[in-house]
């Protein structure tokens, strides 16, 4: 059974789990319904069309040092093959994961000590959109070897006015890997702004 995490909690991912290397990190969200009744939903109305994008920053000693260490819809796979984005979901509609990132911890180079998972809203300024228009946001980790959900973190804070979310981190702790539920909303409007926090 998956462990449910709260903001600020940390958990061992690999300790006591010999051979665990391949993970699937799923991120999901839903647009807040604007109502509109049955016919609105039937005709495709309801919530606003919000294009959230999940990305991973691969950090070296806590710093972002190479633009190729940004894995997102424009660069789907890391050079090492340890981080792979499966592609962009443009609407966030439907149940389950909206975007998925495949991780192979054994392939992540030794100089990379942290993977930061962020979500931002594409073109948020022009579209006047923020995370107050999103509900049911979560990040979860699945063991790819048996498809078992290991943990899930539901982002329950009020993120109204926030345009980016630093959802979680997977980081080295000695010879093991840990997961941290971060859940920090920011006013960064572009991926470059988020990256600048780690330069």
UniProtKB/Swiss-Prot annotation:
Keywords: Cytoplasm, Stress response. It is found in: Cytoplasm. One of its GO terms (cellular component) is cytoplasm. Pfam families: TerD (PF02342). Induction: In response to low temperature and salt stress. InterPro entries: Stress/Tellurium_Resist, TerD. The keyword Cytoplasm applies. Its main location: cytoplasm. Belongs to the CAPAB/TerDEXZ family. This is Stress response protein SCP2. It comes from Bacillus subtilis (strain 168).
